């Protein structure tokens, strides 16, 4: 289905559009008749200019801001008039902001007649379709109809792999279609919203430019050619990476999809409904707003705090009227809140105090030493709550306790030294600080100076494998996490609530035995007294409280129910508003890149089966190594200064990583001093370095054999001499030598004939007679049966032969990536076909089950509930690790005066629970169980002149296809996976770790807080929270808690599998897999198409071939060169192949003439390479005496393994046989002489 899509983009079958501009021809071709004459051309030109010149179209919009004032006249109750000119000034600036740039104007001009809207059933534009190269193309995920009378009726061909569909463009529209290009060098390109940057193989745009509804828009170069088609985007902090469709030089479509991509098809709007009491209303159109009714607006937010459309409701609450701009300010949400006073542990670095800039919390999860601070003051607002970039506001700790303001220059942040303020919003500051044991935020103004210090260790952080104090100017960029400085980002929510009543003695005055309630100017206060009877009231001016004679009999407080305050443990929760709201936590932790140093590259000295790394660094740098065989033996060491490290390297290879350099893999060659084809001492020297044990055994055995042979030969010669010196006695009693006497004992023998044998069987054993007689008869019967079945077999075989369209070839390929396996397919009646199979990549894909995710927790301590002269009771709550406790006898007196009348009956309900940290979305770990693993390999198969790439599962069942080729692989010879049953994934690194089961949490251990996903509501935790009794000096919630198990695990997690996996596996995630593991062998069955074979009559026939090896160096590379001299009957292509595993040829096919010679290169690991080579099926033997390589260490793995018969050179065998032959000859000669002497001297009477 996709093949037509490729061909459509690759062949360019349609002519390019002409240079002449013909505006909006597509809209006039079908519905209207063609106009003739000069008037028609002038009208078309006028229409095109008015539609395309955007700058002229925007200028007449200046007088249009007149309608809004008409609506404002309907509400004459609002007295302040200065508010009217402010929106007019803003609207005057709108045309300047929306004026398109040069790139945008060019894109709009080119899109006018070539880009079509795609609409849904409601008529909303949800995407776009593009006319290009004779086709109309539309993203597949854009479900709608093209807004064109002709194009909407076309039949589209779908390509799900590339998320595109296309149809033939009508002939009368083809000349105006876009053309595409596969050339897109790095730089900037044009699209509907301005400039698009192409760098590092990705298209990116500034954040906030483009979004839903832009799917299908083209990205064009300066010539107007389409470079890519936009499908979606992925938010990456300050920029957005685009998901696009591009084309390579061959016209093949390439889809690029960044991680986290969202499709940019405008989804239909679904209006969410919110509640207020029993009345429902659209969340984007609440019945009131905060400016009109602050208290009711907060009621609406609190009642819908858990609604999915809470953000939409919050946005609508913050603006009044539907006629205004739909886009709100990014800093106006904290106008709902108020600063407050809180208890600071260390004010002015000395003692506790009630501070207007109390530090609530400090986050230091970023990798660039940036911290996020939450305080009780608010930044970016003036005292009225309006957004002001250079101001902050705080709650005054003077008697009036009013909100005051100051300039941001008065705010100072420090740790062990001053910090650099990066950004601020609401309660939050973002700063980059040096390491220290505490964080201090201070207000240093001319009127007053105050500070708050929080004990918090800010440790020096670094990313990568090299420690540094300051980031370098030049180096290498690697992934890291930083706090986003943009104020629009959100890391989650912070809980808010209405403030409770706090009593202040400054609101009471005692004079002449009377008590007066004295409210601040323009404020209301409420007093409660126990002067015999209970008395209460709310006053706005100085008022006497009758019947009371002492201040301690009364409390007075003010309570503002039109503002939220942070859910701080230093504030009392209001009794009438226990519900909570929430606001966004700014400065989200996002993935980014950080500049890190790169240490000096090590000076590597290669030796025989070892390397020496001469290291020199002025900062701590990590050196890790692992072997690439079955036993990785990983090592880890932090190094500083000058040093030398030595490592042994074998044939399997060694990988070392020095600092932030890329991993380096080295392999040992079988290099050694001496000469395997030289004199004996050179042979012994060579093999002693390669195989010391066997060489020592061989030399010792030869020496022992020589000594034994010489000794036995000498002894036998002495014995023979002594026995043979005595002559025979010619006496009457002479004896015959034993050797002659033995000859007389030899008896003659002859075989019986067949007739005699059968006669014997007939007379003595008739059953054996019949058995012997039936043997020839059985042979005749079997032969006749075979001849009778031969003809039907050939008929059946001939019937099926015509249906076979492929030839099956089975082989076994080593699972070593990038090492080709070569074979020669010999089929009767056809010329030999060369076959090359290369495992390009392999993946071990385990089936996984995520048990839970865990991360650092945040302890939420809500504002306590305080009840005077009574008791409270805890209620169950649906929070993780929720703890509640009621304490009595609290707060008889507080800062500023009496809070409760009673001395011991007062009670406080303290609560605490945990939540996932605000930065959990970026910094969390996945606990995963691993089950049965599958294996998938990417194969490159070359047969004849055809090359195919395909992916196939190695299970022996699932076939893989590529064009006419069918492959079945597996099962692999040995099952293997580097993963244990339980693994943990953290920031792309994989660890084998036996984590606790889901629901079995333990405080201070990995998994102390668990959730099935980052957005799920099933959070469970066990952190050992223990609430303590508060002291009477101020409102607070003391508690103790276990440390974060996630943080403890991060500090003791060990090395990841990426650095310790055996067989050189590369570990990857999303999905979890092990890549390019070199182990085992893969059986492969290939169905080769018949068209790939050439009949013998059509292929060159080589009659003679001779091999001469001109040069040979055994190594990992192709160090051998051989010349094949041949005689052929015609010119053509011939496959050349090595039939021995001793050597691998580099060439697969050579061009032959009628007579000549070709040179081939081969690789071997043996000093004596004797291998059979075939040229067009004609075989010959190449004998090569190879020399050892000069390089001891190489960067490529070996292509051949050593074989025993080729591991020892022919010269070595000759010398060895000579040594053993000399010793055995001496031994045999000695024994022969001894035997002869014994036979001649021993006599027999």
Curated annotation (Swiss-Prot):
Side of membrane Extracellular, spans: 329-690, 752-763, 807-1214
Residues covalently joined to lipid (S-palmitoyl cysteine): 724, 744-745
Domain (Peptidase S3): residue spans on this chain: 114-264
EC number annotated for this UniProt entry: 3.4.21.90
Extent of Polar residues compositional bias: 38-49
Disulfide bridges in this chain: 283-289, 480-594, 529-554, 531-548, 724-745, 855-920, 868-900, 869-902, 874-884, 1065-1077, 1107-1182, 1112-1186, 1134-1176
Marked site (Involved in dimerization of the capsid protein) residue numbers: 189, 222
Positions glycosylated per UniProt: 278, 524, 646, 945, 1051
Keyword Cytoplasm among record annotations: no
Motif position, Nuclear export signal: 146-156
Region annotated Host transcription inhibition, chain positions: 37-70
Stretches for region Interaction with spike glycoprotein E2: 157-162, 249-253
Pfam short name (any one): Peptidase_S3
Superkingdom of source: Viruses
Region annotation (Binding to the viral RNA) ranges: 86-115
Chain positions covered by the region annotation Disordered: 1-106
Gene Ontology biological process terms in this record: fusion of virus membrane with host endosome membrane; proteolysis; symbiont entry into host cell; symbiont-mediated suppression of host toll-like receptor signaling pathway; virion attachment to host cell
Region E1 fusion peptide loop, residue ranges: 890-907
CC terms in the record's Gene Ontology section: host cell cytoplasm; host cell nucleus; host cell plasma membrane; membrane; T=4 icosahedral viral capsid; virion membrane
Annotated site location: Cleavage: 264-265, 328-329, 751-752, 806-807
Positions of region (Ribosome-binding): 100-114
Renumbered residue ranges of the record's region Functions as an uncleaved signal peptide for the precursor of protein E3/E2: 265-279
Chain location of the short sequence motif Nuclear localization signal per the record: 63-100
Misc. comment: Structural polyprotein: Translated from a subgenomic RNA synthesized during togavirus replication.
Domain notes: Structural polyprotein: As soon as the capsid protein has been autocleaved, an internal uncleaved signal peptide directs the remaining polyprotein to the endoplasmic reticulum.
Protein name: Structural polyprotein
Originating organism: Sindbis virus subtype Ockelbo (strain Edsbyn 82-5) (OCKV)
């Amino acid at each position: 289905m996709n093949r037509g899509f490729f061909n459509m983009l690759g062949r360019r079958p349609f002519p390019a559009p002409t240079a002449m501009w013909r505006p909006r021809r597509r809209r006039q071709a079908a519905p209207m008749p063609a106009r003739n004459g000069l008037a028609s051309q002038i009208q078309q030109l006028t229409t095109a200019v008015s539609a395309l010149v955007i700058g002229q179209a925007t200028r007449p919009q200046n007088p249009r801001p007149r309608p809004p004032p008409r609506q404002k006249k309907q509400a004459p109750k609002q007295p302040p008039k200065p508010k009217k000119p402010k929106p007019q000034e803003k609207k005057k600036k709108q045309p300047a902001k929306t004026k398109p740039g040069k790139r945008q104007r060019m894109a709009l001009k080119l899109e006018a007649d070539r880009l079509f809207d795609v609409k849904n059933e409601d008529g909303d534009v949800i995407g776009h379709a593009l006319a290009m190269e004779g086709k109309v193309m539309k993203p597949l995920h854009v479900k709608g109809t093209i807004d064109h009378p002709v194009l909407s009726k076309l039949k589209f061909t779908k390509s799900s792999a590339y998320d595109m569909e296309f149809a033939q463009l009508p002939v009368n529209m083809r000349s105006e279609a876009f053309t595409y290009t596969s050339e897109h060098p790095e730089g900037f390109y044009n699209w509907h919203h301005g400039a698009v940057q192409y760098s590092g193989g990705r298209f990116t745009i500034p954040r906030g430019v483009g979004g839903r509804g832009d799917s299908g828009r083209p990205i064009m170069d300066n010539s107007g050619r389409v470079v890519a088609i936009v499908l979606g985007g992925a938010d990456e902090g300050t920029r957005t990476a685009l998901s696009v469709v591009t084309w390579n030089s061959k016209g093949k479509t390439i889809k690029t999809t960044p991680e986290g991509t969202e499709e940019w098809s405008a989804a239909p709007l679904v209006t969410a409904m919110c509640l207020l009491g029993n009345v429902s209303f659209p969340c984007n159109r609440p019945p009131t707003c905060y400016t009109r009714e602050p208290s009711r607006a907060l009621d609406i937010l609190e009642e819908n705090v858990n609604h999915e459309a809470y953000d939409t409701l919050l946005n609508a609450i913050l603006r009044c009227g539907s006629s205004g701009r739909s886009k709100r300010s990014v800093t106006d949400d904290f106008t709902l809140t108020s600063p407050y006073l809180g208890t600071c542990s260390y004010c002015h670095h000395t003692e506790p105090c009630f501070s207007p800039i109390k530090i609530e919390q400090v986050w230091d999860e970023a990798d660039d030493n940036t911290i996020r601070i939450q305080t009780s003051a608010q930044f970016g607002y003036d005292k009225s709550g309006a957004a002001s970039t250079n101001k902050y506001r705080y709650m005054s700790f003077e008697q009036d306790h009013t909100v005051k303001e100051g300039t941001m220059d008065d705010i100072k942040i420090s740790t062990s030294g001053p910090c650099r303020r990066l950004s601020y919003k609401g309660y939050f500051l973002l700063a980059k600080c040096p390491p220290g044991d505490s964080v201090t935020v201070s207000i240093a103004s001319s009127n007053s100076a105050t500070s708050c210090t929080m004990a918090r260790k800010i440790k020096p952080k670094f990313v990568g494998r090299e420690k540094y104090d300051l980031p370098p100017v030049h180096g290498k960029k690697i992934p890291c996490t930083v706090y986003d400085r943009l104020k629009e980002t959100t890391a989650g929510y912070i809980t808010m609530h209405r403030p409770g009543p706090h009593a202040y003695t400054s609101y009471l005055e005692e004079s002449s035995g009377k008590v007066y309630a004295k409210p601040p100017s323009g404020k209301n206060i409420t007093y409660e007294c126990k002067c015999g009877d209970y008395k209460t009231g709310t006053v706005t001016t100085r008022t006497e409280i009758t019947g009371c004679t002492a201040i301690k009999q009364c409390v007075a407080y003010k309570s503002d129910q039109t503002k939220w305050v942070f859910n701080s443990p230093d504030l009392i929760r209001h009794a009438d508003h226990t519900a909570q709201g929430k606001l966004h936590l700014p400065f989200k932790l996002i993935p980014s890149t950080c500049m890190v140093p790169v240490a000096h590259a090590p000076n590597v000295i290669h030796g025989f089966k070892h390397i020496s790394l001469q290291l020199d660094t002025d900062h701590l740098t990590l050196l890790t190594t692992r072997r690439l065989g079955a036993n990785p033996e990983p090592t880890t060491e932090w190094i500083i200064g000058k040093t030398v490290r030595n490592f042994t390297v074998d044939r399997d290879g060694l990988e070392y990583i020095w600092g932030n350099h890329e991993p380096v893999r080295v392999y040992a060659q079988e290099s050694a001093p001496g000469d395997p084809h030289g004199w004996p001492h050179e042979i012994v020297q060579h093999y002693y370095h390669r195989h010391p044990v066997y060489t020592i055994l061989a030399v010792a055995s030869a020496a022992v054999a020589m000594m034994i042979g010489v000794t036995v030969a000498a002894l036998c010669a002495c014995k023979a001499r002594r026995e043979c010196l005595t002559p025979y006695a010619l006496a009457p009693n002479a004896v015959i030598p034993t050797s002659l006497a033995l000859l007389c004992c030899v008896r003659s023998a002859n075989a019986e004939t067949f007739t005699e044998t059968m006669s014997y069987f007939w007379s003595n054993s008739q059953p054996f007679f019949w058995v012997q007689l039936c043997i020839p008869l059985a042979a005749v019967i079997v032969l006749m049966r075979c001849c009778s079945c031969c003809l039907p077999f050939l008929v059946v075989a001939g019937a099926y032969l015509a249906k076979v369209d492929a030839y099956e070839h089975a082989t076994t390929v080593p699972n070593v990536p990038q090492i080709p396996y070569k074979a020669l397919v010999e089929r009767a009646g056809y010329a030999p076909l060369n076959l090359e199979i290369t495992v390009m990549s392999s993946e071990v894909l385990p089936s996984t089950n995520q048990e839970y995710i865990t991360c650092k927790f945040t302890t939420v301590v809500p504002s306590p509930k305080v009840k005077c002269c009574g008791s409270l009771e805890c209620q169950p709550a649906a929070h993780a690790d929720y703890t509640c406790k009621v304490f009595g006898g609290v707060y008889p007196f507080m800062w500023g005066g009496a809070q409760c009348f009673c001395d011991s009956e007062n009670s406080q309900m303290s609560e605490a629970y945990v939540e996932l940290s605000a930065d959990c979305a970026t910094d969390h770990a996945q606990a995963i169980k691993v089950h049965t693993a599958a294996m998938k390999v990417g194969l490159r198969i070359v047969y004849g002149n055809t090359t195919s790439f395909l992916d196939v599962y190695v299970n022996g069942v699932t076939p893989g296809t590529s064009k006419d080729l069918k492959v079945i692989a597996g099962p692999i010879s040995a099952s293997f996976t580097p993963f244990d049953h339980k693994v943990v994934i953290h920031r792309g690194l994989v660890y084998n770790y036996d984590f606790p089961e889901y629901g079995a949490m333990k405080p201070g251990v990995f998994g102390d807080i668990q959730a099935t996903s980052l957005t799920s509501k099933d959070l469970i935790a066990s952190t050992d929270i223990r609430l303590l009794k508060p002291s009477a000096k101020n409102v607070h919630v003391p508690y103790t808690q276990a440390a974060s198990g996630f943080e403890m695990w991060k500090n003791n997690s060990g090395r990841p599998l990426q650095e310790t996996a055996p067989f050189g596996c590369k570990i990857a995630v999303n999905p979890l897999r092990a890549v390019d593991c070199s182990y085992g062998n893969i059986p492969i069955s290939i169905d080769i198409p018949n068209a790939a074979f050439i009949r013998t009559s059509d292929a060159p026939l080589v009659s003679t071939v001779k091999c001469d090896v001109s040069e040979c160096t055994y190594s990992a590379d192709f160090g051998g060169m051989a010349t094949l001299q041949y005689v052929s009957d015609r010119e053509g292509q011939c496959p050349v192949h090595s039939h021995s595993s001793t050597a691998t040829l580099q060439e697969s096919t050579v061009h032959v003439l009628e007579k000549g010679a070709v040179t081939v290169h081969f690789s071997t690991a043996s000093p004596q390479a004797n291998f059979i080579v075939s040229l067009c099926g004609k075989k010959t033997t190449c004998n090569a005496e190879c020399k050892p390589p000069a390089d001891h260490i190489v960067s490529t793995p070996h292509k051949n393994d050593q074989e025993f018969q080729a591991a020892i050179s022919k010269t070595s065998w000759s010398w060895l046989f000579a040594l053993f032959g000399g010793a055995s000859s001496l031994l045999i000669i000695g024994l022969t002489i001894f035997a002869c002497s014994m036979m001649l001297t021993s006599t027999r009477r």
